[in-house]
Amino acid sequence: MAPVLSKDSADIESILALNPRTQTHATLRSTSAKKLDKKHWKRNPDKNCFNCEKLENNFDDIKHTTLGERGALREAMRCLKCADAPCQKSCPTNLDIKSFITSIANKNYYGAAKMIFSDNPLGLTCGMVCPTPDLCVGGCNLYATEEGPINIGGLQQFATEVFKAMSIPQIRNPFLPPPEKMSEAYSAKIALFGAGPASISCASFLARLGYSDITIFEKQEYVGGLSTSEIPQFRLPYDVVNFEIELMKDLGVKIICGKSLSVNEMTLSTLKEKGYKAAFIGIGLPEPNKDAIFQGLTQDQGFYTSKDFLPLVAKGSKAGMCACHSPLPSIRGVVIVLGAGDTAFDCATSALRCGARRVFIVFRKGFVNIRAVPEEMELAKEEKCEFLPFLSPRKVIVKGGRIVAMQFVRTEQDETGKWNEDEDQMVHLKADVVISAFGSVLSDPKVKEAMSPIKFNRWGLPEVDPETMQTSEAWVFAGGDVVGLANTTVESVNDGKQASWYIHKYIQSQYGASVSAKPELPLFYTAIDLVDISVEMAGLKFINPFGLASATPATSTSMIRRAFEAGWGFALTKTFSLDKDIVTNVSPRIVRGTTSGPMYGPGQSSFLNIELISEKTAAYWCQSVTELKADFPDNIVIASIMCSYNKNDWTELAKKSEDSGADALELNLSCPHGMGERGMGLACGQDPELVRNICRWVRQAVQIPFFAKLTPNVTDIVSIARAAKEGGANGVTATNTVSGLMGLKSDGTPWPAVGIAKRTTYGGVSGTAIRPIALRAVTSTARALPGFPILATGGIDSAESGLQFLHSGASVLQVCSAIQNQDFTVIEDYCTGLKALLYLKSIEELQDWDGQSPATVSHQKGKPVPRIAELMDKKLPSFGPYLEQRKKIIAENKIRLKEQNIASSPHKRNCFIPKRPVPTIKDVIGKALQYLGTFGELSNVEQVVAMIDEEMCINCGKCYMTCNDSGYQAIQFDPETHLPTITDTCTGCTLCLSVCPIVDCIKMVSRTTPYEPKRGVPLSVNPVC
């Protein structure tokens, strides 16, 4: 009997065992069975788990805010980029948060990092440790929505980490005169005490201002202050701190370790005698605030302050911090941590990594009064730390030279808000180790004496002006913890930033110079910012290739003026006509597209408009063009004009536009709606003969360049472009919007619907949804007409997409929908992004990057994961019993490394230098054309197959489903582990990669065996090719 071809074979049926099927009846399964099922598939922590995960010597990143590229892009695209954004008002260092998030969403990670470091020299550190819920995130407008606020800290960390991986040094402000031509004031000697966040920030800004003799004196043999010694490695790695210090040193700042502010070493008086013109004190609060009940207790007895414990942990876990490797403190048994701030929680989670069996966090007040950020508390809770509120320490019990317990009394708050201690309610807790985290003070008399003659306040701290950070001694400034204003790293950074300007102002005054009334601190610069992105086209010099399309952003010339002020290189006017052809628009007329699905707000992938050309007169536009060219001679202004098929009309309007001073003309022969009914726009642009003649008329009328704007609503756009060239056009714009009907409501009415009758017409679709159409138009024109100038438009919303059009053969880039999604300031992102993309092409070490995206490492939740198959010849997913196995294997490996005294190697910063010339815009135009051709030119011998990275796989089975119901049934899906496996029947179609939610979890690799198609029925004749 002949086999039934339309039924799956037995082996395929086996593969399809877990493939979704439509439900025909309710499913029955007992509660007890479902409880077992739940345990098998569980990914989050089990509430009934009493065994703490072994964390000894595990200093891997534990932050919930950490993001990989996939997560960062999704989060950045979710951001609204609000007007007058509240998040920015809540940031101590005044970061332009919405702008750096815009850059991340556009995959311009350098642009984001530049924006961050410009206002915060410790931008990576702050991205990791900032208490964002109390700061920027607390003001996020998305708190008013179901999905909640943006993970700003995670985005900041991601962008700055990518820049760190670029290994590009900071450079001196390029707008400053050469050092030898700077005034004498900039050679003034400046001293800073303490190499912590406040001093690093202050020194960085002073160096950016141009000061060349800046020295930081640090008491310890390591740098970074509390960022190094007290914030644990799993929250802030040492190589991050070192990276930011190296950025500062790129500007010539010197650091001398082993020198402290003390009467025994250096004082303000001796500093002044040595010729220092200004000093900044940023030494923090070096001594612990120790309760009287702990006097006389030692580490050997099991007592630590946070100032003792955390530096010991840091030295044992932070590779590169010290010259020699130090062991972690050995903590065993039960630990009591006293305090409820971030430091207390750092002590608790660090104790677990030093071997503690159980950790109790004890504090005087209730949960609602905990000062630590919620993330820190949540992490401690997840690691099974216990919380004991309303307890005040009374006595430490010592037996046999070791701490064995502590006594506490209960605290209560009365109706007036006052806290009282109830001696009748005693609590006795057994413990082996006690860690006090009750804050820090400045109590060393030698340090205070060294600060003489500055005044101190009633808290024993230097008295400063909170605006200028100036002490009672005009030449001495202070900031950070030591002055008591800053409570966080980011606030310390801002203290140093604030002080830098007023130090600058003070020094200049000492040399008889003045500074601007409004502070103007320089931005962060690298060699990327020096890249030239100007380009010439049709004899015109464009300062950058980005301009306004003839559309809504150019509705008026005052808008064009604002665009030029923002940095746009050129602009087209909105299309205008002779007065006899003037139009009046309908409303509504511009609507969001349906191509983004139910995603509302910015970032729309398409818009549809039924807007006609400008309602303003030709006289308005011509006078305005004259004004713009007078005020912006370096910017290109292109007048966009439209007439019916009438030689006299085209001649008249073209001459008027040329006489106005326009640099060039764009002939709108492609408006897809409305104007065609008047014999204009599309009515002319779809016929090569009409296009050729109109171009000839305009060529006869004017001397300036002109470009024909092409419509994609034709069968062969090249024939239209060729006709324009034959008619004398200097180039073409490709393309205008695509004619379409965006959507219908459930009652059959369209949107937009005009008037009571709710009628509509086909409109023009714009945005990233039409980018594939625009890319085809540009490449096909560039291939057919080599060297013929092309102005690209259609879905350009970033430097990355702009580069695609340059590679396709365009010379300049017109933007509309991206501005509708945001505002004119996106130009800054586009320019820095394009400069970075060009610069990175010259770095040999980064050739495996895709633009600004680093090569993907195996990760889960944005964090690198150890390859279990390398530690144990076994593949394990990350859920249920397999997750527990993974944790056990990792824990055993961490302990093995500790026992073998294997320390992680310190990361050394090696700056990458270009090995080849940085390409110009001209160099990259048309680069992609060599790869385009006919299907017949493609190889059907060089085949690929899919390869899955099991460590990155989240076991969703999307690859399995699409292969089953849209492909070749070439993926097996394990019923227990949900790990997919590619079979040898894979044809390399790439559908699996296309639907996979994890970037680079699936890759296509070369097929090692010949590809033999499954024909179903044997061929009856030999194929001809």
Curated annotation (Swiss-Prot):
Indicate the residues that form the catalytic site: C671 (proton acceptor)
What residues bear Phosphoserine in this entry?
S905
**Positions that bind [4Fe-4S] cluster 3:** C953, C956, C959, C963
Q: What is its EC number?
A: 1.3.1.2
Q: Mind telling me which InterPro entries this protein's record contains? A: 4Fe4S_Fe-S-bd, 4Fe4S_Fe_S_CS, Aldolase_TIM, Dihydroorotate_DH_cat, DPD_II, FAD/NAD-bd_sf, FAD/NAD-binding_dom, Helical_ferredxn
Which GO terms of type biological process are on file? beta-alanine biosynthetic process; thymidine catabolic process; thymine catabolic process; uracil catabolic process
Identify this protein by name. Dihydropyrimidine dehydrogenase [NADP(+)]
This protein's encoding gene: DPYD
